[in-house]
Structures are given as structure tokens and as C-alpha cells.
A protein has these predicted regions:
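Gly/Ser/Thr-rich phosphate-binding loop
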Residues: 234-239, 249-316, 329
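Structural core segment of the AMP-binding/adenylate-forming
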Residues: 42, 67, 71-140
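Conserved AMP-binding/adenylate-forming
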Residues: 22, 37-83
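Conserved AMP-binding A3 loop
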Residues: 25-27, 147-174
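AMP-dependent adenylate-forming
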Residues: 3-25
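Conserved beta-loop-beta connector loops within the AMP-binding
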Residues: 331-351
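Conserved pre-ATP/AMP-binding loop-to-beta segment of ANL
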Residues: 134-151, 158, 181-187
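Conserved AMP-binding/adenylation subdomain of ANL enzymes
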Residues: 170-187, 197-236, 246-251
Length: 351
């Protein structure tokens, strides 16, 4: 069994996901993902790496679908809920997806897919209300099986699909869990898109691997982020520089009394991370003045996950991305592929 999912059995009664003021245990996640896996399998024993696209808001259902695809032996292809139809069509065509799992909120958006492609449609709402008649036998999934395709941002052309095996995914998770000292007592707010590594691996998967809780907001809202902070339940937060800039701007517009309420909540956090783009030093310094936290910067790519990070417990240097994460080896080479001495620029190679 995939270790990420197997770990969930050790935390069955703990809260795994919180969304829209509802909480779901790991047991509920396992049961729901099993139901989705069966719906995808129909009469098959194994999806054998069939590409299964899915589009649903950040939620408990998102995780159920992702895990359901994996437990059935498929490759999960998350679609961006904000993309126009042409961008979604491109991913379906490029991956040769065999099915798309969707929530009814996106039925209208994806309806043309079923005219343009021979594609099976699976409504998550319909699956969840279906009664399960007997205890199923799901396929055994080896770790070298391909598990996910995530698309790059497409800064140098069309987005490119990056294929990860379950072993790749597991290595990324274990590296971050070790380096950033995740535990089952953690609770993180996830406001990032769930079609990129940052939201899927760094936040969601690390939380679930650890037996922790991942809380979702259905859409980005600065006020709601601070409202969650003020409940003093979350103790980790990860975002991109533009989000920290917006949070700073919003905080500055508040009354001193409202600022004080938020300031108290910052004491509950053990880690705040910035990534996916370079963090301006001015933003880092302003956030530190407001929150008391020095943002941890890290470096990674869709193709490899995270590779470099500032120290969790040690000194964090503004403008620096840090040192190799646990299990990662880094070297810098010249144009002849020779390792350079300290202080000389070159190409970063990651293992």
C-alpha cells in the first residue's frame, strides 16, 4: 500500500481535514477514498496507471478523489479550478486522460470535454451517496508506480506535465517532514492552489503523512485568513510572497484594536514559510515586524519538489534560500560540468 495512505490507519480518529467549518477524520477519508476507488475501478482489478483528471474546490472531497485515484492504481491529474476551458482541454489532451472526476459546481465548465473527447465523467456527489455493498479488495500499488502529473507554470512556453511516481512523492514528503519537524499535533491552513507542488506536497501531503490536520479555505480571502489565525488553532502557514504582501497591506489598514487581536494569534505559530517566487527583503522585514516571525525561504521546482531550505531552527539569512534539505545533495558546476569552488556561480545540480 502507498505509505501516505497506510499511515492514515494509525490516526483513524484524528481530524485530517477541516473545511467550511466541518471536520473529517482519517477514518472518514479512508472510507470515502475507498468508495471513489471502487467507482473508478468498476469491474476492473487495477486502473494500471490510467490518467484520471479531477476538478473540485479545495476541500475534503479533493483529498478523497486524489487518494481514490491512487488506491485504484491510477495517475492523478489535478485541474486548476480557475483555468479557462482551453487550458483544461490542453491538459486532458496532453495526458490522454480516460476520465474526469468533478463536483457539480464545475459541471458547466467541463461539459464541452465530453463532446471533444471520449471521456468518462464521474460526479463526486453521485459517488458519495452510493451505498457500498461489500468490503472491496483494492489493488496493491508498488511505489515505483506513476502516481501524479502536475503541470509547470509554463513560463517558457506551454505548461509541461511532470510525472511523479509514488516513490518520488514519498521522498519529497519525508524530506520536508524531517527538515521542518512535522508532528501529528500540527495544524496548517492551506490557501494555495491544489494543482501545484506547494499546495499539494508541501502542505497537504506533509500534514496527512504526519497525522496532522489540514484546514482549507475554498477561496483566497485575506480577512478569512486572519479570522482563522485568531482562532489560535493553526500553528503553521505557507504562502507565496504576493500573499504576504496582501496580508501586510490589510493589517496596516486595521484599527489598533484589531491589529492587537491578530498580533496575539501569531504567538501560536511555530513556522511560517514563503516560496514559489523570490521573497523581497522588504516584505520579509515588514512581516517580521508585524508577526515576530522570520519567514523561512526555500527553493524547489515542479520537476523535483523542494531541494533547498533555510534552517528551521538556525539563522535565516534574508535573500538566501539556504542549504540542501534532508536526503538532498546539491552541487554547483561550470559549463564543463566540473564542480566549482565556493563563491563561483554556475549551474545547480540536484540529487
Amino acid at each position: 500500500m502507498i505509505n501516505l495512505i497506510e499511515n492514515a490507519f494509525n490516526h483513524s480518529e484524528r481530524i485530517a481535514i477541516s473545511d467550511n467549518n466541518r471536520s473529517y477524520t482519517y477514518r472518514q477519508l479512508l472510507e470515502a477514498s475507498e468508495k471513489i476507488a471502487l467507482a473508478l475501478l468498476e469491474d476492473k482489478k487495477d486502473l494500471d496507471e490510467a490518467r484520471i483528471a479531477f476538478i473540485v474546490a479545495p476541500s475534503f472531497e479533493y483529498v478523497c478523489i486524489q487518494w481514490g485515484i491512487w488506491r485504484a492504481g491510477g495517475i492523478a491529474v489535478p485541474l486548476c479550478v480557475k483555468h479557462p476551458y482551453d487550458a483544461i482541454k490542453y491538459v486532458i489532451e496532453d495526458t490522454h486522460a480516460q476520465a474526469v472526476v468533478f463536483s457539480n459546481n464545475y459541471r458547466g465548465l467541463i461539459k464541452p470535454l465530453f463532446e471533444d473527447f471520449e471521456l468518462r465523467g464521474v460526479s463526486i456527489e453521485a459517488v458519495m451517496v452510493t451505498a457500498q455493498k461489500e468490503k472491496p479488495r483494492l489493488p496493491e500499488i508498488p511505489l515505483d508506480r506513476r502516481g501524479m502529473i502536475i503541470y509547470t507554470s509554463g513560463t517558457t512556453g506551454k505548461p509541461k506535465g511532470v510525472v511523479s511516481t509514488h516513490q518520488n512523492i514519498e521522498a519529497q514528503i519525508e524530506s520536508l517532514v524531517t527538515s521542518w519537524e512535522w508532528t501529528k499535533e500540527d495544524r496548517i491552513l492551506n490557501i494555495l492552489p491544489l494543482h501545484h507542488v506547494h499546495g499539494i506536497i508541501n502542505i497537504l501531503s506533509c500534514a496527512l503523512w504526519s497525522g496532522a490536520c489540514c484546514e482549507f479555505l475554498e477561496k483566497f480571502d485575506v480577512k478569512k485568513i486572519f479570522d482563522v489565525f485568531c482562532k489560535q488553532e493553526v500553528n503553521l502557514f505557507m504562502a507565496v510572497p504576493t500573499i504576504y504582501y496582501q496580508l501586510i497591506h490589510y493589517w496596516k489598514e486595521l484599527t489598533p484594536a484589531d491589529q492587537q487581536k491578530i498580533d496575539v494569534s501569531f504567538k501560536n505559530f511555530r513556522l511560517m514559510v514563503s516560496g514559489s517566487a523570490a521573497l523581497p527583503i522588504s516584505t520579509l522585514e515588514e512581516w517580521e515586524k508585524i508577526s515576530g516571525h522570520t519567514l523561512l525561504e526555500r527553493y524547489g521546482m515542479t520537476e523535483m519538489g523542494m531541494a533547498i531550505s533555510n534552517s528551521y531552527k538556525g539563522i535565516r539569512k534574508p535573500g538566501h534560500i539556504g542549504v540542501p534539505l534532508a536526503g538532498v545533495i546539491i552541487r554547483i558546476v561550470d559549463e564543463n560540468n566540473h564542480t566549482v569552488v565556493d563563491g563561483i556561480s554556475g549551474e545547480i545540480q540536484v540529487k
